[in-house]
Every structure is written in C-alpha cells, then in structure tokens.
A protein has these predicted regions:
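Ribonuclease/tRNase effector modules and their secretory precursors
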Residues: 1-119
C-alpha cells in the first residue's frame, strides 16, 4: 500500500515517503486493547480503504505527519496512518469507527476532504 501523490497534493503533505505498512496481528491486539471491537471486521478491508477512501485528512493534533482515511460503510471506518521517519515509511496506527456526527463535523471544519480516486 502507498500514500499516493494525489493524496499528498490534496492534503499538502511534503514527503517522498510513500510505503504504508501494517502488522495485522499487532493492529488487532491494539484494537482489542482500545475497545475498537466494532472495527475489527474491517481489517480485511484495509487495502480497499487506503486505495479508495471516501474522505482523507490530516490529524492536526499530531506533530509528525498523520493521515486519516475514512470509508463510509454501514459504520464509518477511520484508518489512522502515522509516519515512521527512522524506517522511512508510514504505518497503520489504528482503525476505528466514527459516528455520522463526528464525520460531518470533521468535513465541516475541513479536517477531512472528499476524495475521488477518478478525478
């Protein structure tokens, strides 16, 4: 998986790093610890969410590059991606659901931007 140039341009991210890695086992353990049980079923859809998100954004609370991918299924799923400068890649830090209110709020304040893979 890769952080595409199209998403970098949309979000004004300046880095040559593009590879996105994740360990399904470690991510599942993290999700269970954080009580993200409702998003566990989406682990098999990570490629789809990252390759074709409905919305993308940058987490303003993180000092380093942190990208958010959102896919609207029955429940809205957010995949948080963080940069690992030492290893020269990005990694999936967390996966969880966000409710419609929070999704709309993030769109309204422009934290999330609509993404169309075909544009």
């Amino acid at each position: 998986m890769k952080l595409t140039n199209k998403i970098k341009e949309l979000l004004c991210i300046k880095t040559d790093i593009e590879d996105i890695l994740f360990s399904k086992k470690a991510l599942k353990k993290h999700m269970l610890k954080r009580n993200h049980h409702d998003a566990l079923k989406c682990l098999d859809n990570l490629d789809e969410i990252i390759e074709s998100p409905d919305y993308v954004g940058v987490n303003p609370r993180e000092q380093a590059i942190s990208v958010e991918y959102v896919k609207c299924y029955e429940n809205n799923v957010l995949v948080a991606i963080k940069i690992n400068i030492d290893n020269n890649n990005f990694y999936v830090a967390s996966v969880y659901t966000i409710d419609e209110y929070k999704l709309n709020k993030h769109i309204r304040i422009k934290r999330l931007k609509k993404f169309d893979k075909n544009e």
